[in-house]
Amino acid sequence: MAVFEKVQEIIVEELGKDAEEVKVETTFDELDADSLDVFQVISEIEDEFDIQIETEEGLNTVGDLVAYVEEKTK
């Protein structure tokens, strides 16, 4: 499964959104995600990909998060 699809699946599960709402360019604000929601998503992603996400700075969109995960899992 590609990184985007897995990240999308986690966001859908954690935030209760439809997959159609979670696109690369979608911001977490557009998903009505507060800081706790983002923390939960990041925690799940860290577990799934066995990485440590150092900061949420610059992770404003789903695409930003996907790019970060892809870089960390190279």
From Swiss-Prot:
Modified residues (O-(pantetheine 4'-phosphoryl)serine): 35
GO biological process: lipid A biosynthetic process
Keywords: Cytoplasm, Fatty acid biosynthesis, Fatty acid metabolism, Lipid biosynthesis, Lipid metabolism, Phosphopantetheine, Phosphoprotein
This protein's GO CC annotations: cytosol; membrane
Subcellular location: Cytoplasm
InterPro entries in UniProt: ACP, ACP-like_sf, PP-bd_ACP
GO molecular function, one term: acyl binding
Principal location class: cytoplasm
Residue ranges occupied by any Carrier domain in the UniProt entry: 1-73
Domain of life according to the entry: Bacteria
PTM comment text: 4'-phosphopantetheine is transferred from CoA to a specific serine of apo-ACP by AcpS. This modification is essential for activity because fatty acids are bound in thioester linkage to the sulfhydryl of the prosthetic group.
Pfam families: PP-binding
Presence of the UniProt keyword Ligase in the record: no
Pathway terms, separated by semicolons: Lipid metabolism; fatty acid biosynthesis
Function statement: Carrier of the growing fatty acid chain in fatty acid biosynthesis.
NCBIfam families: PRK00982.1-4
Family membership: Belongs to the acyl carrier protein (ACP) family.
Protein name, entry field: Acyl carrier protein
Record organism: Streptococcus thermophilus (strain CNRZ 1066)
Gene field: acpP
